From Swiss-Prot:
Broad class of enzyme this protein falls into: hydrolase
Family designation: Belongs to the LpxC family.
Pfam families in UniProt: LpxC
InterPro entries the record matches: Ribosomal_Su5_D2-typ_SF, UDP-acyl_GlcNac_deAcase, UDP-acyl_GlcNac_deAcase_C, UDP-acyl_N-AcGlcN_deAcase_N
Cofactor needs: Zn(2+)
Species of provenance: Nitratiruptor sp. (strain SB155-2)
NCBIfam families: lpxC (TIGR00325)
GO cellular component: membrane
Recorded superkingdom: Bacteria
Name of the protein described by the UniProt record: UDP-3-O-acyl-N-acetylglucosamine deacetylase
Disulfide bonds: none
Keyword Zinc: yes
GO biological process, one term: lipid A biosynthetic process
Gene name of the encoded protein: lpxC
UniProt KW keywords: Hydrolase, Lipid A biosynthesis, Lipid biosynthesis, Lipid metabolism, Metal-binding, Zinc
Length: 298
């Protein structure tokens, strides 16, 4: 299986979730073996997509370098991962990725517009060899060895609409588009009100998030999936997993996970070389996920 980039440059204008200010985002092709690279045009600063550059995970996944940051990258990166893109330049003129509708589907449409192009170099895959786990009380995230990438997620909220939700997801581009990409971010009205009082969530609205009060969903059109909340948690995790810089072969299990735990898991995984091996992708399904590999450890 070969590395991929986009065929042509594309651009979109939206607003940032927290500051609520307009931001222009441009996606451009990159040559093979370049990886995913962000560029803050207003600060003339490049930031590589890697766990070492994560600077904040409280409300979103934020990367930064030398004091220059880019916030809320996870939904975009979930789409980039879903499309199997290895090399991409993401240019922004502000410090937030545009939130769009709060899911990944708008970014998927943007990538469809750009087109996907295979390159000459073989795609590298990170294969999990040893189980790695991070816990915070009863919350946990873990990666286990497996021959494909899949997610087994459970969330539990003390809310009559959400309660306990579980979803098992077998990763492929087709499944991503059908089951995960349209799942929106969500929040509670009292949290939104507090965030706005401290200058955050200025761009949040019912057009780009599911908002719940104490008893019900406030969005007039309701949910896109009965279990949209846990599906969005998987969307987030895919985006956070993209910071590893290559596709992953493993089972990702989570109970009440978060951006913070996702990040700690990627860091812990990379701490010990025995936890993983890097192989060349050799066999794929029609949808594009790896089901076999030729050993080529680096």
């Amino acid at each position: 299986m070969r590395q991929r980039t986009i065929e042509r440059s594309v651009e979109v204008v939206g607003i940032g979730l927290h500051k609520g200010v307009p931001v222009t985002m441009r996606l451009e092709p990159l040559e093979e073996n370049s990886g995913i690279l962000f560029y803050r045009k207003d600060k003339n600063r490049y930031i590589e997509l890697k766990p070492q550059n994560v600077v904040d995970t409280k409300m979103a996944t934020v990367i930064g370098k030398d004091g220059v940051v880019i916030s809320t990258i996870e939904h975009l990166m979930s789409a980039v991962y879903g499309y199997g893109i290895d090399n991409l330049l993401i240019i922004l003129d502000n410090d937030e990725v545009p939130i769009m509708d709060g899911s990944a589907i708008s970014y998927c449409m943007l990538l469809d517009e750009a087109g996907i192009m295979e390159q000459k170099s073989t795609k590298k895959v990170l294969r999990i060899k040893n189980e790695v786990e991070v816990r915070d009380g009863d919350k946990y995230v873990r990666l286990k060895p497996a021959d494909t990438l899949s997610f087994d997620f459970t969330i539990h909220f003390d809310h009559p609409v959400i309660g306990k939700e579980h979803y098992h997801f077998e990763f492929s581009k087709k499944n991503f588009l059908e089951e995960i990409a349209r799942a929106r971010t969500f929040g509670f009205l009292h949290e939104v009100q507090y965030l706005r009082s401290i200058g955050l969530a200025q761009g949040g609205s019912l057009d780009n998030a599911i908002v719940l009060d104490e008893k019900k969903i406030l969005n007039p059109d309701g949910l896109r999936f009965e279990d949209e909340f846990v599906r969005h948690k998987i969307l987030d995790a895919i985006g956070d997993l993209s910071l590893l810089g290559m596709p992953v072969m493993g089972l990702y299990e989570s109970f009440a996970g978060s951006h913070h735990l996702n990040h700690l898991l990627t860091v812990k995984l990379l701490e010990e070389c025995s936890n993983y091996e890097i192989v060349e992708a050799s066999t794929t399904t029609q949808e594009g996920y790896v089901i076999g590999a030729a050993c080529a450890k680096e």
